[in-house]
Amino acid sequence: MNKEKAIVVFSGGQDSTTCLFWAKKKYEEVIAVSFDYNQKHKLELDCAKDICKKYNVEHHILDLNLLNQLAPNSLTRQDITVDKSAPKEGVPNSFVDGRNLLFLSFVAVFAKQKGVNTIITGVSQSDFSGYPDCRAVFIKSLNVTLDLAMDYEFEIITPLMWINKAETWKMAYDLGVLDIVKEETLTCYNGIKADGCGECPACKLRKKGYLEFEKQFMC
């Protein structure tokens, strides 16, 4: 298994950017892979491109526009408004069915062609917002499936799986990239960089985590 190279599933948001810099500390060569799935806000991809260019990371964008046809949701459809809070039943309408499954599967194919075994993704079960494809059991089962499907040994690493948003901010701080993550990333479901709109679930979670980070670790 090649332990010197890693591929990061990279959206340009808080979590994946933290994982990108975590990977840069641990591996000699890091490649970032982003996806164009016809998301409303192309600024997400612009952020990803800008970060990779600025910090000298090889970057690839894969076309996954078909996902928008298969799974209508508030992140890809202009006529669907993002839920401001989680529903009492079911998943938020910002959940894209199959997104992490497809992202990781496509990245695995890409990784094998590059001779890379390690795939890093920023999913977290602690702050998973009700998304079933952010759970550890899903990642573990998919890892086994990909190994069997391609007769190749993958290692899917999830640095954020068991930490909350405050601890994710702390990780960025420890890596020396707190300002980069705070100012140069896009987490907002309404496509606003840095602090975002402040109203969507992603912005609320990000802000809550930052305030808890300041209270717990910076006092």
From Swiss-Prot:
It is an enzyme of class 6 (ligase). GO terms for biological process: queuosine biosynthetic process. It catalyses: 7-carboxy-7-deazaguanine + NH4(+) + ATP = 7-cyano-7-deazaguanine + ADP + phosphate + H2O + H(+). Zn(2+) binds at C188, C197, C200, C203. Binds 1 zinc ion per subunit. InterPro entries: QueC, Rossmann-like_a/b/a_fold. Its cofactor is Zn(2+). ATP binds at F10, S11, G12, G13, Q14, D15, S16, T17, T18, C19, L20. The keyword Metal-binding applies. Belongs to the QueC family. Catalyzes the ATP-dependent conversion of 7-carboxy-7-deazaguanine (CDG) to 7-cyano-7-deazaguanine (preQ(0)). This is 7-cyano-7-deazaguanine synthase.
